[in-house]
Amino acid sequence: MGLGANDDLRGIVRSLRLRMLLLPLFTIAGSLLFSAAAALLPGNRPLAECLAVGSGFGYYSLSSVLIADVGAASLGEGGAAELATVALLANVVREMFALFCLSLFARWCGRVAPISAAGINSMDVCLPGIVRYSGGSTQLVPLAVLHGIALEVSVPLLIGFFCRF
């Protein structure tokens, strides 16, 4: 069976290590780095807006609503709605790209690469693919779930921070 059918919750919790928090931290750093690089493209948005969009980590439903709400103070209603639409599309594309390329990420970049590429979706939509293409065992499931939860907690904090500029 899988993780949900496992009665040994204590053993699963004991298997979590502090080192596992490095993956979400590196995912956040990499996503923000590439979002900052997007600000350098000709005709693109300011750095803070690109970082706010990148802070969604694939969480399209929450990130677009937060950007529309928090960004209205600094961007105005129209600007915030436009940026929220960009965030929605960027995060949907991230999820679809991760979902369709999980096998390539695992083959070319290692077993944990699909977890990082999936972002928040590592704990739900992409989890079956992560298990399948990262060796077929449920060994990485606790890491994928921890990764998704850590990113989910960081989304409102980072979007709130970057939308203030």
Regions found by a protein language model. Give the residues of each.
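C-terminal ends of transmembrane helices
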Residues: 3-14, 36-42, 102-107, 127-134
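Entry/N-cap segments of selected transmembrane alpha helices
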Residues: 8-39, 84-96, 143-153
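Membrane-embedded alpha-helical core segments of multi-pass
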Residues: 1-5, 30-34, 59-62, 94-101, ...
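Transmembrane alpha-helix/helix-exit interface in multi-pass inner-membrane proteins
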Residues: 32-53
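Alpha-helical membrane segments and immediately flanking helix-loop junctions
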Residues: 48-97, 109-146
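Glycine/charged-rich beta-loop-alpha catalytic/anionic-binding loops adjacent to active sites
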Residues: 17, 44-45, 111
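Juxtamembrane boundary at the C-terminal end of a transmembrane helix
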Residues: 156-165
